[in-house]
Amino acid sequence: MTESKRPRVMVDMSATLIHHGHIRLLKKAAEIGEVVVALTSDEEVKKTKGYVPELNFEERKEILEGIKYVSEVVSCPWLITEDFMKSQHCDLLVHGADNSNHIPAEKLIIFPRTEGISSSMLRERVLDSLIEMNLDDPKHSRASDKVARFLIESIKKEFRIDQKRTSLSPYGRGRQGRPQQES
């Protein structure tokens, strides 16, 4: 008697700042089959999202390879095609609810996003923390103040944040920088 082969499941992501939502998605995918992460390159992220990832491709790849649910990490284009899936010998594509890939429904599994977390939200939390640290704690040295101000200004420029704002909304931004709809 032969054991039936588990499907190879592709999970595409940019994972610019890896968080527990990514881990949960990978865990769910691993329940279905062998997980192949299709990771977008730094160039694809810059071209599509408009910024350079905080962690470069090799750093993101190394982190993902260290996750027990992941069998393999491959570089991928922004949009996954059936041909790309075939080239990686994958049977299914798993994606979050923000899917824009053009894969037939029978080969696509959509999982809802993890509430309350996204890479964009992490960026906002870092910025808010830097602002709070810089404004509220007089113990910080001039050097740390300079670093904090530099980082704040860099983040504001990179993400085109209104220069007059001193705090950010707790809500993330959707694909292509559009605010997400609240439900």
Give the location of each predicted region:
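Nucleotidyltransferase catalytic core that binds NTPs
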Residues: 1-129
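A short glycine-/small-residue-rich loop at the edge of a beta-strand within enzyme catalytic domains
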Residues: 17-20, 135, 139-142, 178-180
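Divalent metal-dependent catalytic cores for phosphoryl transfer on phosphate-bearing substrates
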Residues: 159-183
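Amphipathic, well-packed alpha-helical segments that form the structural scaffold of globular domains
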Residues: 145-156
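A generic structural signal for residues located within well-ordered alpha-helices
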Residues: 21, 59, 139, 143, ...
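Nucleotide/phosphate-binding catalytic cleft detector across ATP-hydrolyzing
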Residues: 132-141, 154, 160
